[in-house]
Amino acid sequence: MKTAHEVRPGNVIMFEGSPWVVQKTETTRSGRNAAIVKLKLKNLLLNSGTETTFKGEDKIDDIILDRLDCTYSYFADPMYVFMDAEYNQYDVEAENLGDAAAYIVDGMEETCQVTFYEGKAISVEMPTTIVREVIYTEPSARGDTSGKVMKPATITGGGTISVADFVKVGDKIEIDTRTGEFKKRV
């Protein structure tokens, strides 16, 4: 048990009978009144979000989830299958991957963290940076060099991100998976 003051982003709490990951906390104090803690939460089972408030001294059940390093194996509609170092396979529903699904490709070498709740794989966390190939983008516009010019590009895995104007089809680029932003050409 933690008080609402002690909860930090990244903690997993039990709220309304489900596990929720804390994405953001905001504490406000007003004159004589006790502190109010506002939490932005994401439900790990339903992949939905909400915001809620607690009094600073309210007790909150924190839970510790199991996490395991795994590699992507294959897609069996509607499940993504991941394998650990001991060749155990874990199914994760496609809807639970969220934005990570755009970065998953056959034969990927990056290791992902699979999160478990009560023995069931419920989510996948990608590495913070990955390298993917650009499979489609428009050619650069000649003479358009005023400032930071970005254009849309489709990467292996099917995701679309904004890349710098100098990036061409076939280039390998580094992507920040937390924000979905282009970092550099590799």
UniProtKB/Swiss-Prot annotation:
This protein's pathway: Protein biosynthesis; polypeptide chain elongation
GO biological process terms on file: peptide biosynthetic process
Primary location: cytoplasm
Superkingdom, natural source: Bacteria
InterPro entries: Elong-fact-P_C, NA-bd_OB-fold, Rib_uL2_dom2, Transl_elong_fac_P/YeiP, Transl_elong_KOW-like, Transl_elong_P/YeiP_cen, Transl_elongation_fac_P, Translation_prot_SH3-like_sf
CDD domains given in the database record: S1_EF-P_repeat_1, S1_EF-P_repeat_2
GO cellular component, one term: cytoplasm
Keyword Zinc-finger set for record: no
SUPFAM superfamilies: Nucleic acid-binding proteins, Translation proteins SH3-like domain
GO MF: translation elongation factor activity
Record keyword Glycoprotein present: no
Pfam families reported for this sequence: EFP (PF01132), EFP_N (PF08207), Elong-fact-P_C (PF09285)
Places the protein is found: Cytoplasm
Keyword annotations: Cytoplasm, Elongation factor, Protein biosynthesis
Entries under HAMAP family matching the protein: EF_P
Function recorded in the entry: Involved in peptide bond synthesis. Stimulates efficient translation and peptide-bond synthesis on native or reconstituted 70S ribosomes in vitro. Probably functions indirectly by altering the affinity of the ribosome for aminoacyl-tRNA, thus increasing their reactivity as acceptors for peptidyl transferase.
Family from the record: Belongs to the elongation factor P family.
NCBIfam families tied to this protein: efp (TIGR00038), PRK00529.1 (NF001810)
PANTHER family recorded: ELONGATION FACTOR P (PTHR30053), ELONGATION FACTOR P (EF-P) FAMILY PROTEIN (PTHR30053:SF12)
Protein name per the record: Elongation factor P
Record lineage: Bacteria, Pseudomonadati, Pseudomonadota, Gammaproteobacteria, Alteromonadales
Gene coding for it: efp
